[in-house]
Amino acid sequence: MKSLRGFGSDNNAGVHPEILAAIQKANLGHVPGYGEDIYTQEAIEVFRKHFGSDTGVYFVFCGTAANALGLTAATQTYNAVICASTAHINVDECGAPEKFSGCKLLDISTPDGKLTVDLIRTVLHGRGDCHQVQPRVISITQPTELGTLYTLDEIKAIAEFAHQHNMILHMDGARICNAAAAMDLPFHAFTRDAGVDILSFGGAKNGLMYGEAVVFFNPQMAENFEFIRKQGAQLASKMRFIAAQFTALLSGDLWLQNARNANRMAGLLAEQVSVLPGVHLAQKVQANAVFASIPQAVIPALLEDYFFYPGE
């Protein structure tokens, strides 16, 4: 690859200078470890300003951990988690959700990465049957792994259905900042206010060096999460360096600047490539992901200059 820039993933980008500065600023003196420091408490309060004063906030190292441990907190081993077949928890987490929760994933094929109430109904036939797993969680990703967005009404409909059937709604928000920017809504509007119970809040895909947060909107669901996080090897001894990044990201509008720029660049890329001969977009670009079908013959030459992920 000749170019320093590529099109593979937001994970390939560097760290925002303001985030690096926040890490450096936190790198002074001795403070208590394991989250008992002023930086972690400050970051938790920043989250609560976005989501509500009784929000439970727990920092972890990565998105897979946020999803796997968040789902563990909400389930028993005889439960199941309903998700789209394209969901990150289903195809890109090496079975971590199943390992930690002990639950089965019930994946549903969708044309656009989005679940609907009608699709969810198709896997509820075994409820109450002791021979079958019992669905407890519906997990959606916003934006989805195909770059599509749930509307606010779609999220509310799934949440209402989940709660009517004694289930909870989990949202994988690895790119939640991009979703908020694209929807032009505050975080709480399409999460807590819409009926989401547990949220994985992503940071690394929006300018952080590393770090995600598991966010609980029902305090009872977080009752044992400190133990689950420790057992899951996600209790950072020097947690201030995760927390300080989130404070820098979320205290002002840095998160929004980053997300808007990423979304805008994705839109520009889609606009430029879609007019090329033999190229068409697989999904409408709604956030910061572009999935395009391009002629097989040109892929090797493109990869010599720019990294991207060839799909099927």
What are the residue ranges of the model-derived segments?
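Active-site phosphate-binding strand-loop segment of PLP-dependent enzymes
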Residues: 7, 115-173
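Hydrophobic beta-strand scaffold residues
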Residues: 104-105, 169-171, 281, 308
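Buried hydrophobic positions in well-ordered alpha/beta secondary-structure cores of metabolic enzymes
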Residues: 7, 47, 66, 97, ...
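Conserved N-terminal alpha-helix of the aminotransferase class I/II PLP-enzyme fold
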Residues: 16-63, 85-86, 90-91, 96
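Active-site pre-lysine segment of PLP-dependent enzymes
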Residues: 151-160, 164, 175-198
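PLP-dependent aminotransferase-like
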Residues: 74-135
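Active-site C-terminal subdomain of aminotransferase-like
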Residues: 137-139, 149, 186-277, 281-287
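Conserved C-terminal alpha-helix-loop-beta "cap" of PLP-dependent enzymes
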Residues: 78, 267-269, 273-312
